[in-house]
């Protein structure tokens, strides 16, 4: 390929990435983004006005003030009207932006806890997210279900290094710090699947520390949460039952599954693994093929993964273990085809 064409391809590549992951800070899907977006548009509008004014002034000076042989260019020193204008206009613009910013900061106030908020505890790990619904005790990882129209209050910390929790389509990012609790709240105005990302460099797989937020109507969320509370792992097929035995022998020391003796806390809770659309914290699609590859060689698929490889598992054991993990579904899980943006 001609190297001179590479710069021309950059916008196409970036555009393709945007279309795939639909991460957009200008999305008006939450009150936070709406307020901040309006402020950014106001600042952009003033920037355009100033730019147009500067271009006009430069052209005016070039055309009207150019020097001819023997001419004395017109002088503007002592022009009180011009000097007052050059001081008053920037002062007015800066003042408007200042007070608009103060008003926006007061409106969003996303660190305080609303009275009717759903409280979710968030813990960042290298390289995945742990979520606990505080009132119900339901625990999940990497993919979070929330109700629309109701504030969700996040109490966040980290188990190892500093991470940063950010779902751009819903609002502001906040660091998760070991030994500290940081807080914020967000509200999704409409149903959808919103993509998030760790935005604090945290190790080799920082870019692979992703998450998804599934926003559904309140009634649908309540039904899902009730089903998640009542969930007990009960594999039906013979393959899934054999896979449960493999899981207990190979995985239970690090992972937990609700309603079983597996209560590990080192890795993600896998109680609802069959519901998740991805594995590896948003990196790979949740299909049997990728699941078996992940189990066989997690560090090879995600650099820095603390999950050991299991090359000694037979193909039959991998198939059974995958069948068991895919069977772990709660009742009333939202149909993502209906809520996907």
Label each region the model flagged.
Residues 142-144, 171-175, 185:
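Beta-strand-rich interaction surfaces with strong enrichment in secreted/lumenal proteins
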Residues 96, 176-229, 235-237, 249-252, ...:
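Extracellular/periplasmic metallocenter environments
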Residues 115, 137-140, 219-248, 332-341:
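Electrostatic cytochrome c docking/interface patches
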Residues 125-127, 149-151, 157-161, 170-172, ...:
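Solvent-exposed coil/turn segments that connect beta secondary-structure elements
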Residues 90, 122, 154-156, 198, ...:
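Conserved hydrophobic/aromatic pocket- or pore-lining residues that grip, position, or stack substrates
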């Amino acid at each position: 390929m001609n190297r001179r064409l590479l710069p021309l391809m950059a916008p196409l590549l970036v555009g393709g990435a945007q279309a795939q992951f639909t991460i957009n800070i200008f999305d008006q899907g939450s009150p936070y983004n709406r307020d901040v977006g309006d402020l950014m548009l106001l600042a952009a509008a003033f920037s355009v006005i100033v730019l147009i004014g500067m271009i006009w002034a430069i052209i005016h000076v070039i055309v009207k003030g150019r020097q001819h042989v023997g001419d004395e260019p017109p002088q503007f020193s002592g022009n009180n009207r011009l000097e007052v204008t050059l001081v008053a206009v920037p002062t007015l613009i800066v003042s408007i932006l200042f007070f608009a910013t103060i008003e926006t900061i007061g409106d969003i106030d996303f660190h305080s806890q609303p009275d009717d908020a759903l409280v979710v505890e968030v813990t960042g790990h290298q390289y995945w997210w742990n979520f606990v619904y505080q009132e119900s005790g339901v625990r999940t990882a990497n993919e979070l279900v929330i109700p629309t129209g109701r504030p969700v209050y996040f109490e966040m910390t980290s188990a190892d290094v500093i991470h940063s929790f950010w779902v751009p389509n819903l609002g502001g990012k906040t660091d998760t710090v070991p030994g500290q609790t940081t807080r914020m709240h967000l509200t999704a105005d409409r149903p959808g699947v919103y993509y998030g990302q760790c935005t604090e460099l945290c190790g080799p797989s920082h870019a692979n520390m992703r998450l998804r937020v599934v926003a559904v109507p309140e009634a649908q969320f309540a039904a899902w949460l009730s089903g998640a509370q009542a969930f007990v792992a009960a594999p039906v097929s013979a393959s899934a039952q054999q896979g449960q035995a493999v899981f207990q022998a190979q995985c239970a020391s690090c992972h937990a599954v609700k309603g079983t003796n597996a209560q590990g806390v080192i890795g993600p809770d896998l109680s609802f693994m069959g519901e998740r659309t991805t594995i590896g914290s948003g990196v790979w699609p949740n299909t049997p093929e990728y699941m078996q590859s992940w189990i066989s060689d997690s560090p090879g698929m995600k650099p820095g993964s603390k999950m050991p490889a299991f090359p000694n598992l037979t193909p039959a054991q991998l198939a059974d273990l995958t069948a068991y993990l895919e069977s772990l579904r709660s009742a009333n899980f939202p149909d993502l085809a209906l809520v996907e943006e």
